[in-house]
């Protein structure tokens, strides 16, 4: 990786230089975030301009937002039209998701969706984990999807193998 989002926002490179095309999915591009950047908040207006430009070039622009509601959250959400709140069915994660949804409600987004990740039906049956209905009731949103828990996801992340190229319960959710 030669350039990242901060390089792009600081005009150290052109968009085509910062975009990384996925080798397996030719229509999928990424712009890597800077690993360390304390001055990220200085670029909110430039990010908004960049996202506006990307919307003209691409059908979808996904911004992976850090967990929680710190500066990175506000920065990432500033240019969004729509949000997908991803949570696991653990009480603490659902509470955090509830706080995020409350903040998003005040940001004039066209749509806020819910995606439940790392869902373990066996644990739900044993009443050791919140059910999909529990999560939906607590957050006041219907889930657009439920991704089953799968140990192979951890393996794929650690080895850099795209999840969608593996045959797992989680990939079947897509």
Language-model features: where?
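Flexible, glycine- and charge-enriched loops at secondary-structure boundaries
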Residues: 5, 90, 167
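Short, hinge-like loop/turn segments at secondary-structure boundaries
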Residues: 1-3, 103-104, 130-134, 161-165
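P-loop/Walker-type NTP enzyme "switch/lid" segment
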Residues: 1-56, 155-164
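P-loop NTP-binding site
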Residues: 142, 152, 161, 172
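Histidine-centered active-site loop/cap adjacent to the catalytic His
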Residues: 167-174
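Conserved catalytic-core segment of NTP-binding enzymes
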Residues: 45-49, 53-149, 155
């Amino acid at each position: 990786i030669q350039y990242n989002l901060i390089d792009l926002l600081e005009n150290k490179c052109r968009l085509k230089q910062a975009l990384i095309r996925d080798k397996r999915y030719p229509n999928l591009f990424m712009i890597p975030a800077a690993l360390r950047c304390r001055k990220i908040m200085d670029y909110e207006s430039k990010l908004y301009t960049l996202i506006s430009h990307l919307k003209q070039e691409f059908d979808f622009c996904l911004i992976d937002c850090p967990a929680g509601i710190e500066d990175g959250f506000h920065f990432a959400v500033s240019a969004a039209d729509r949000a997908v709140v991803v949570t696991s069915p653990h009480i603490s994660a659902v509470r955090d998701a509830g706080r995020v949804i409350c903040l998003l409600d005040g940001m004039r987004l066209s749509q806020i969706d819910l995606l439940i990740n790392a869902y373990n039906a066996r644990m739900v049956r044993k009443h050791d984990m919140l059910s999909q209905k529990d999560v939906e009731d607590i957050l006041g949103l219907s889930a657009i999807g439920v991704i089953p828990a799968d140990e192979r996801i951890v393996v794929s992340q650690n080895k850099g193998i795209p999840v969608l190229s593996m045959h797992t319960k989680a990939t079947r959710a897509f």
